[in-house]
């Protein structure tokens, strides 16, 4: 056995001997998170993100704290970024696998599954060949609830197969980092479950070496797409769907039925999380989603009722908006719902404090 083979064998064996801490006498990585750090420092991670730590292109944008667009209160909006373009990042263990093809396929399936749930899902590119720059991909998520960049990972060690959700840095001036980590954990747990990887998935962060936005604080994202999304105030994750340098994972990702299954499960994760978030922050009767009950809300209810009575087929922007309009919870929109909204509005205008019910309270009562 030559020296390289001996080292590779030793590293492969150590991956599955994972004590909670690294002993002083053993400098090899022991956990998936330590392995990610090790691979990056040794420059043997074969994934290419397009020289992400250079060419920051948001100079013309104002700072996110001053310009972030608020998501639509009525509609869940997800921006999906299919990683790379053309026939890029081939597997070194299975002929015919290209990361760019997998990400394009999975992203389109995910878009379909989200739309079936009533979510507005959009892509950062229009074809397999389309290859927008990295930060502008993130910028496209302005006003969306979430940005998801779809990838598979690569390394020189073929035994590694854990999924990785790359999340935002810990930030004390916003809560989008909390959303990034929360959704990242849900996604990596789901990908681990669906792909049945041998190693449990992790959430991970990579800090830029530079002050990319020029605010004097070294707290920026290394990954260009995440840097761009964070800059416009959108929580996001770069999701590595295991490693295409692992034989079993690569074969799994080449099966169309598996990608469809994965898309369905990830769509359910995203829909459930953001539907719950919107419900927990929405009053019943607040049809327009502006945070209060008003005459305008009652007018929207009456307009819907009148169109329905005239034999038309009125619609709201989402089922969440319909739920807020159904004030009495009888699964229909009537004049009574509008009257209840007006009564609540009148009490508030008179300085009283009527009881307001959140959509989430009704959903879980």
Please report, for each region that a protein language model flagged, where it lies by residue:
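Surface-exposed patches in mature extracellular/periplasmic domains of secreted proteins
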Residues: 119-129, 150, 195-207, 277-280, ...
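Catalytic-core regions of hydrolytic enzymes
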Residues: 42-183
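Active-site-adjacent mobile loop/cap segments within catalytic or ligand-binding domains
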Residues: 79, 88, 149-156, 204-280
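Extracytoplasmic/secreted envelope proteins and their assembly/folding machinery
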Residues: 104-107, 111, 138, 144, ...
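Sec-dependent N-terminal signal peptides of Gram-positive bacterial secreted proteins and lipoproteins
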Residues: 2-25
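Sec-exported extracytoplasmic/periplasmic mature domains
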Residues: 108-119, 142-146, 152, 188-197, ...
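Cellulosome-associated attachment modules in secreted, modular CAZymes
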Residues: 22-27, 279-365
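Active-site-adjacent substrate-binding region
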Residues: 180-221
């Amino acid at each position: 056995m030559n020296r390289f083979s001996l080292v590779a064998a030793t590293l492969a064996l150590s991956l599955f001997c994972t004590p909670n801490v690294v002993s002083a006498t053993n400098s090899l990585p022991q956990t998936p998170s330590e392995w990610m750090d090790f691979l990056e420092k040794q420059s043997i991670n074969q994934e290419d993100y397009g020289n992400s730590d250079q060419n920051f292109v948001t100079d013309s944008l104002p700072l996110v704290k001053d310009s972030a667009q608020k998501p639509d209160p009525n509609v869940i909006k997800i921006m999906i970024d299919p990683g790379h373009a053309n026939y890029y990042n081939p597997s070194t263990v299975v002929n015919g696998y290209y990361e760019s093809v997998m990400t394009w396929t999975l992203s389109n399936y995910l878009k379909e599954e989200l739309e079936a749930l009533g979510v507005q899902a959009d892509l950062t590119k229009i074809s397999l060949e389309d290859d927008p720059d990295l930060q502008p991909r993130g910028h496209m998520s302005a006003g969306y609830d979430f940005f998801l960049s779809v990838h598979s990972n690569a390394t020189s060690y073929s035994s590694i197969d854990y999924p990785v959700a790359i999340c935002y840095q810990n930030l004390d001036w916003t809560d989008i980092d909390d959303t990034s980590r929360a959704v990242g954990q849900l996604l990596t747990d789901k990908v681990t479950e669906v792909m049945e990887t041998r190693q449990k998935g992790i959430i991970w962060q990579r800090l830029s070496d530079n002050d990319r936005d020029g605010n004097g604080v070294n707290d920026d994202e290394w990954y260009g797409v995440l840097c761009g999304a964070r800059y416009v105030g959108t929580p996001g994750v770069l999701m590595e769907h295991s490693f295409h340098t692992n034989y079993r994972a690569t074969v799994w990702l080449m099966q169309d039925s598996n990608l469809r299954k994965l898309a369905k499960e990830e769509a359910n994760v995203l829909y459930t999380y953001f539907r719950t978030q919107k419900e927990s922050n929405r009053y019943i009767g607040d049809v327009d989603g502006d945070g209060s009950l008003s005459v305008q809300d009652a007018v929207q209810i009456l307009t819907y009722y009148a169109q329905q009575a005239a034999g038309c087929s009125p619609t709201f922007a989402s089922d969440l908006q319909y739920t807020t309009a159904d004030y009495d919870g009888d699964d229909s929109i009537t004049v009574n719902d509008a009257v209840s909204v007006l009564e609540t509005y009148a009490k508030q205008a008179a300085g009283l404090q009527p009881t307001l019910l959140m959509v989430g309270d009704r959903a879980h009562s």
